Amino acid sequence: MKIENIRNFSIIAHIDHGKSTLADRLLEYTGALSERERQDQFLDKMDLERERGITIKAQTVRLNYRADDGKDYVLNLIDTPGHVDFTYEVSRSLAACEGGLLVVDASQGVEAQTLANVYLAIDNNLEVFPVLNKIDLPAAEPERVKHEIEEIIGLDAHDAVLASAKEGIGTREILEEIVKKIPPPEGDPAAPLKALLFDSWYDQYQGVIILARLIDGILKKGDKIQLVSTGRSYEALKVGVFAPVMREVPQLSAGEVGFVIAGIKDVADAKIGDTVTHTLKPCTTPLGGFKEVKPMVFSGLYPIDTSQYEQLRDALAKLKLNDSSFSYEPETSLALGFGFRCGFLGLLHMEIIQERLEREFNLDLITTAPTVVYRVHRIKGDMISIESANQLPPTQEIDYVEEPFILASIHTPNEFVGGILALCEEKRGVQREIKYLTPTRVMIIYELPLNEVVLDFYDRLKSITKGYASLDYEHLDYRRSELVRMNIMINGEVVDALSLIIHRDKAYYRGRDLVSKMKELIPRQMFEVAIQAAIGAKVIARETVKALRKDVLAKCYGGDITRKRKLLEKQKEGKKRMKNVGNVELPQEAFLAILKVEE
């Protein structure tokens, strides 16, 4: 295949703007899918991806297309996830392309995540051209949306392709635009092999499968290859392309996209963004931009039924094979037993992993409240990173604590601005700017502590704006904050699973809500139970569950007052003794309640 007849492109779109359906139409039009294989969202392989209508793992597909100029082209569609949690995967997938289709819903207009991904594409020097999808809808306003694209993103949209993926309108025009507007890859097949690894996953029978875009050189079956970041060498057992099913080819050359199977056992070795080269004749400079992805949000996962611990461990190990950005380590809690502390890229990532565990492995799980990574600077001059309240050192050792901040951009119709500003202020946000993109669409930019966003920010944003707002965020930096550890004590004993790290100004209100919630949930005992919220030794809120009391005077009809007094005193003594030895079993609901208070 001549390199000037190759086009590598991706589709950039916000959730629900019709990206996967458009990909289906392109596959059908170029004959990559027969009628028999047709199914909606062909590239979204996981059930979860189909149900939520989102793309989680990148996929690629090779399309053969004969253009109007009579030449045959190979078009490589590299499907990217659209969600903010997977930004790094998106940026690597985009780095494998020369161009992109910006798909915008003609009835909705530009959304926050579209914007974030377009900027990523422009940073990677991609040639981007707009496509207005869903023009068959009665609510479609192509002219308004074209104007929006020009105003907000600064792309020339006067000749944007009008399409409807559902009805199959505009498919040919899109393919022609790809051939005309997107430049062919640059690369030298004679140079040493240099390829960008932009996705990898684990296959039960063949080990790790790598998706790579060749920048220079040629890769043949049987070649000895090396991954630059780890320096390990492997033999290329199979080389091929997805069309859209796996098909082996004798070789891949510069500019092409394909898969390599090299008997790699662990996905953690095949890191996204790494450079693949020949062992004997390596390239001199690896590709830039490789970074290790670090989890930002942590949460404990515990099996409701403790006998499922082993199953949970195996399930996590299997998920880890496909998702190297997810991390876990065992932890124990006095209240919940044995479980794992897991790290995720963000909230959506966390939900997806939990749902996959419950769905694919039939596990029943409890998840503790999500937390973020704090930096604790100690008086003796060192700094430690912690991700749960139980790791926080005693107050007297701490100099100060820092927490991560994010820059959030929220797109919303203008009637909801007031509610959103109030929400951001409540979450200790710092306002950066408010931009009116059009008379009815507003972009609000805030700096927010990630700690506040993880809990319930997204849900509340959606409910304030009736689902119309879209949120995108990027990580900013760490800042010094007045953070304290709040303990929940029951009869004077700290319950470790209920401790949390919280801002001092909010501790009093949270403590009050928590203890009153717990009061409803703890069953009454034969003795009274004190529930307290405390910071260090200072109790900031308290509720008491009153004791159940047996009527010891029932057997005395009339009779002497001293007799009654003796019985009451005896009962009082007994209660006192019981309180010293009695312990309270916390019901499962109490732990879930903690999470609910946050909602």
Curated annotation (Swiss-Prot):
Catalytic activity: GTP + H2O = GDP + phosphate + H(+)
PROSITE patterns per UniProt: G_TR_1, G_TR_2
InterPro entries tied to this protein: EF-4, EFG_III/V, EFG_V-like, EFTu-like_2, G_TR_CS, LepA_C_sf, LepA_CTD, LepA_IV
Keywords for the protein's UniProt record, in alphabetical order: Cell inner membrane, Cell membrane, GTP-binding, Hydrolase, Membrane, Nucleotide-binding, Protein biosynthesis
Gene Ontology molecular function: GTP binding; GTPase activity; ribosome binding; translation elongation factor activity
Bilayer topology annotation: Peripheral membrane protein
Domain tr-type G span(s) in chain numbering: 4-186
Entry binding sites for GTP: D16, H17, G18, K19, S20, T21, N133, K134, I135, D136
E.C. number(s) listed in UniProt: 3.6.5.n1
A GO BP entry: positive regulation of translation
GO (cellular component) term, any one: plasma membrane
KW Nucleotide-binding (keyword) present: yes
CDD domains the UniProt entry points to: EF4_II (cd03699), EF4_III (cd16260), LepA (cd01890), lepA_C (cd03709)
Record localization: Cell inner membrane
Free-text function comment from the UniProt entry: Required for accurate and efficient protein synthesis under certain stress conditions. May act as a fidelity factor of the translation reaction, by catalyzing a one-codon backward translocation of tRNAs on improperly translocated ribosomes. Back-translocation proceeds from a post-translocation (POST) complex to a pre-translocation (PRE) complex, thus giving elongation factor G a second chance to translocate the tRNAs correctly. Binds to ribosomes in a GTP-dependent manner.
UniProt family annotation: Belongs to the TRAFAC class translation factor GTPase superfamily. Classic translation factor GTPase family. LepA subfamily.
Protein name: Elongation factor 4
Gene source species: Geobacter metallireducens (strain ATCC 53774 / DSM 7210 / GS-15)
